[in-house]
Amino acid sequence: MHLQHLFVHRKYVATLLAGVLLVALGSFIALVAPRASANQNTGVKVSFSPLILADKDGTEFPGKPAHLEDPVRMKFAWDASSANPQPGESFSIGLPAEYRYREIGRHDDLVLGNGTKVGDCVTTTETLTCTFNTAISAASDLKGSGNQMIVAQKVTQVNKTTFDANGTGTEVFHPNNERILPIAWVEKDLGKYANSLKR
């Protein structure tokens, strides 16, 4: 009788522990997994300026092509004039396989042309998602612009690719309308170093 009671008690404890673990696991996943995109407003139009080669500090180099692993400046404009945007709705920019966002989890303000903040933008490796806040309800002239640093991660044979502009495929030229080139190795004069080893 005592053994039977002990068995039932252990079974109850095991079930309780399993339930606690499931709740904890669910909470952990909710914390570490990227939050599901807010309700996407596909009426927001996104367009791009030409991609520009840059360096790690963001200095731009117009007229030069990008090599593998080079930083590239992506400038975009968004227009929600006919989208009736609501708080909690979002738009996104998805990158093609040739690029990745340089900073994962980067947060930037989403602002109108007059500087009013109407949301926040956050990056993953492949996607920039901008979500409107409550200020969008009272805003007018619902247009703005932004920019992000991306990185060339694939050598190409063509000079353009397709970005996902909030659900619409949009062709964009690589920097200087050229293909992405292999890493440019720089040869250095090792003569002086070699001579120093002989001494």
Language-model regions, residue ranges each:
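Bacterial N-terminal signal peptides
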Residues: 16-28
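C-terminal region of N-terminal signal peptides and the immediate post-cleavage residues
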Residues: 26-43
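Extracellular/luminal low-complexity Ser/Thr/Pro-rich, glycosylation-prone repeat/linker regions
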Residues: 31, 37, 166-194
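A surface/secretory-pathway sequence property marking extracellular, secreted
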Residues: 40-57, 97-135
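Short beta-strand elements of extracellular/lumenal beta-sandwich folds
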Residues: 68-83, 195-199
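Surface-exposed beta-strand/loop patches in extracellular or lumenal glycoproteins
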Residues: 77-100
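Low-complexity, intrinsically disordered segments enriched in Ser/Thr together with acidic residues
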Residues: 131-177
